[in-house]
UniProtKB/Swiss-Prot annotation:
The lineage of its organism: Eukaryota, Metazoa, Chordata, Craniata, Vertebrata. It is found in: Secreted. Sulfonation of the reactive cysteine Cys-10 enhances the stability of the native conformation of TTR, avoiding misassembly of the protein leading to amyloid formation. It holds the Pfam family Transthyretin. Belongs to the transthyretin family. This is Transthyretin. Thyroid hormone-binding protein. Probably transports thyroxine from the bloodstream to the brain. GO terms for cellular component: extracellular space. Gene3D superfamilies: Transthyretin/hydroxyisourate hydrolase domain. Glycans are attached at N98. It comes from Oryctolagus cuniculus. One of its GO terms (biological process) is purine nucleobase metabolic process.
């Protein structure tokens, strides 16, 4: 397809912003876990945010099946690298995915040293 449409098939994207500096949060470690039948968290995917604060290509629609997922952001390391002592060890988002058919999920996080907020954008996948 045309340039720029490659991400439409990417069912899970993470975007992280630095609310203090008004910039993308670069090189934030992201770990995704999936809840197993015995209620434990199994590692599912991981990566680091890019220069735009985004992380694409974590999984595929085939692997991203219905279930409960946890997205964990290593915010403490991010702030410490900037010489700031943050309050939280990490930021996490736990959610149920694909329970009514396949969707595309963007998990956005806005970080401050003592606060964070997250927003989920859920859309039907592009054909």
């Amino acid at each position: 397809g045309p340039v720029g449409t490659g991400d439409s098939k990417c069912p899970l994207m993470v975007k992280v912003l630095d609310a203090v500096r008004g910039s993308p949060a670069v090189d934030v470690s992201v770990h995704v876990f999936k809840k197993a039948a015995d209620e434990t968290w199994e590692p599912f995917a991981s990566g680091k945010t890019s220069k735009t604060g985004e992380l694409h290509g974590l999984t595929t629609s085939e692997k991203f099946v219905e279930g409960v997922y946890k997205v964990e952001l290593d915010t403490k390391s991010y702030w410490k690298a900037l010489g700031i002592s943050p309050f939280h060890e990490y930021a996490e988002v736990v959610f149920t995915a694909n329970d009514s058919g396949h969707r595309s999920y963007t998990i956005a996080a806005l970080l401050s040293p003592f606060s964070y907020s997250t927003t989920a954008v859920v859309s039907n996948p592009q054909e």
